[in-house]
UniProtKB/Swiss-Prot annotation:
Name of this protein: UDP-glucuronosyltransferase 2A3
Gene that produces this protein: UGT2A3
Keyword Phosphoprotein annotated: no
CDD domains per the UniProt record, alphabetical: GT1_Gtf-like
Signal peptide positions on this chain: 1-23
Subcellular location: Membrane
Keyword check for Plastid: no
Amino acid sequence: MRSEKSALVFLLLQLFCVGCGFCGKVLVWPCDMSHWLNVKVILEELIVRGHEVTVLTHSKSLLIDYRKPSALKFEVVHMPQDKTEGNEVFVDLALNVLPGLPTWQSVIKLNDFFVEIRGTLKMMCESFIYNQTLMKKLQETNYDVMLIDPVIPCGDLMAELLAVPFVLTLRISLGGNMERSCGKLPAPLSYVPVPMTGLTDRMTFLERVKNSMLSVFFHFWIQDYDYHFWEEFYSKALGRPTTLCETVGKAEIWLIRTYWDFEFPQPYQPNFEFVGGLHCKPAKALPKEMENFVQSSGEDGIVVFSLGSLFQNVTEEKANIIASALAQIPQKVLWRYKGKKPSTLGTNTRLYDWIPQNDLLGHPKTKAFITHGGMNGIYEAIYHGVPMVGVPIFGDQLDNIAHMKAKGAAVEINFKTMTSEDLLRALRTVTTNSSYKENAMRLSRIHHDQPVKPLDRAVFWIEFVMRHKGAKHLRSAAHNLTWFQHYSIDVIGFLLACVATAIFLFTKCCLFSCQKFNKTRKIEKRE
């Protein structure tokens, strides 16, 4: 008996050792807010699988709570700026300025904001890379891989300084410029819409003209406006000339937070992997008070309303417009809202500082989801098959709702010009027209019918990079070409030169023949 127990203990120890043999060390450069909520799911799964995860952050993070006990390790630098200052400016910009502007103007305004805060971002980066004690500690730890959200610059620079292979995680960059220029992503403008334009893959002639012009605008304007700033900083930090695309382009894998249930078909590089909806999970039971309210809706069901974690307040006028529309529908409404109680609020509507959004969307009584179009919320709606009323505010939200609208699972309304009648009409359309629910369920079935779950796919590729010290076999040779080689400008120039030479020689031959013929005729006439 004793020998059997000893054998069992020995076997368990062996299994434990084998398991740890595959464990690695992961360094993380995250972005705050909803980006962090998505990345955190990956990190928690990496920890479950036995990996050691260290997160680089600053003292003024909004959602990255490094003080809370966690299996995650944190390396924190102090930032003196008030953490709410930039956030308040951004919320005002997104709610009151961007929605009323054309695409190109809204992008300029958005980038102006990032230009204003990039001094803070640069300071944060300097706090890490010029902290010799911290950098020495990170180098001695010998990390196997770095997981980076490129929305906040410097992660790729850290990876370069530490000589660690890295994986990027993102939805889209501004105008998709980083994916095209740095990731060498093919993007035929005839059917691939430029991100953040609200266009689809079915474009009219004028829309294709707009798509082409915006592509040029994004490429050259962002290069001049933002990339050069960081390239100077990167070059100084590395002690040699470099470009942002040179460092970002070294990413082994790009984890894109979408999937083909959402995306329009288009070409991608082999090191681009889709992990959209990795944070989604089956609905859990609601709190008792909330469940009672939901059940009181009867056959009419409920509507879930949330503008995300960033936009929990709107102006009093806008709140009354929204509340007035909600009061006129038969469904009960759960609205995530922290502002002053609207005077037009109906008895069918309850306000909450926070709601278990995923659990509500997965509830059988949920009929519709009013959303600003954030990627996390969109995917929770896809996961549970809930049709949407989209109220995009800024950034990729316009694109996200355009995708859902094109797939027949959403109705879009303009946040800036929205009236009670607009919102009421959209809600009635989504809740009474069965095609929206059917299309939402179709997308849900596509999402669930994957050979590998999104979270498992994300973790697999991170572990793959750890095991193989990179994924160079998936890296396109396009990264080694200059821009004129990439677009075959040199080949086109050579062929044009050949054609021009041939035309020149042909013309010369014709002229020579004509001159010869004329001379012969003159001689014959004289004779």
